[in-house]
Amino acid sequence: MYLELVKKKSDILDKDGNRIKEVELPIIFSFPVRKDLIRRVFIAEFTHSLQPKGRDPNAGKRTSAESFGINLGMARVPRVKNSGEAALAPNTVGGRLAFPPSVNKKLAEEANVKEKRLAVISALSATADIAFVRARGHVFKDSVRFPIVVTDDIVNLKTTSEVEEFLKKIGVYDDVERVKERIRIRAGKGKMRGRKYKEPIGPLIIVHDSNSPIIKAARNLAGVDVVNAKDVSVIHLAPGAHPGRLTIYTESSIKILDERLSKRVVS
């Protein structure tokens, strides 16, 4: 079965939100969105970032507790001498774990190189579809057309206030406000482990230069990420394996993505 793909068109906006011209997008923005592939590759990339963990083999076993035996009218759990306090067993306070985590456990999932490439293309295609972006929960003005492509000079924005003003002019700052309002304290022990707050995902800005001033300028805006087009992956484009992140491209980043992906997939 062959799919006939039609190239999409998009407006190029300047940093004031004015339409400069219309351009034809690379074919990678017209591919069908493969949710199954995006999920598979997301899990593979995410699990490769996990660190193996284990437990001290003697944890919970540093005690002289032994069972008192039978026919005493009490449970046969190991007990500390002279106190009768239960210890060592998995169902006791301070006892060992029945099945502790092992450093030998295989955490990382695998995916093929071609699957990874096609998953990135699928995720890019979803950013060009307003239905996927809305389904992800992003908020923006009704006048916004997808994908959002802007001129290269936006990478020279040096202050957070300039980036904030730029996002307002292109109609996506409401999404930053949504993230701000929904930052909340995490449930559970993660609060004690350096992960106190949970922050929703906001807009993604894809640039063509890793030394762009906008990278530092935008990092203080809630939920906003700035990534080089050479490094962008499913992790950035489809957080949680949910495609359709609100994404802003610079004109040159589109060309880099085209060179990186089109030649290897489209024959």
Curated annotation (Swiss-Prot):
Which top-rank group of organisms is this from?
Answer: Archaea
Q: Give any Pfam family that matches.
A: Ribosomal_L4
Molecular functions (GO terms): RNA binding; rRNA binding; structural constituent of ribosome
- One GO-annotated biological process of the protein: translation
SUPFAM superfamilies xrefs: Ribosomal protein L4
One of the record's GO cellular component terms: cytosolic large ribosomal subunit
The entry's keywords = Ribonucleoprotein, Ribosomal protein, RNA-binding, rRNA-binding
Protein function: One of the primary rRNA binding proteins, this protein initially binds near the 5'-end of the 23S rRNA. It is important during the early stages of 50S assembly. It makes multiple contacts with different domains of the 23S rRNA in the assembled 50S subunit and ribosome.
Which family does the similarity line name? Belongs to the universal ribosomal protein uL4 family.
Assembly and interactions? Part of the 50S ribosomal subunit.
**PANTHER family associated with the record:** 60S RIBOSOMAL PROTEIN L4
Q: What is this protein called?
A: Large ribosomal subunit protein uL4
Which organism is the protein's source? Saccharolobus solfataricus (strain ATCC 35092 / DSM 1617 / JCM 11322 / P2)
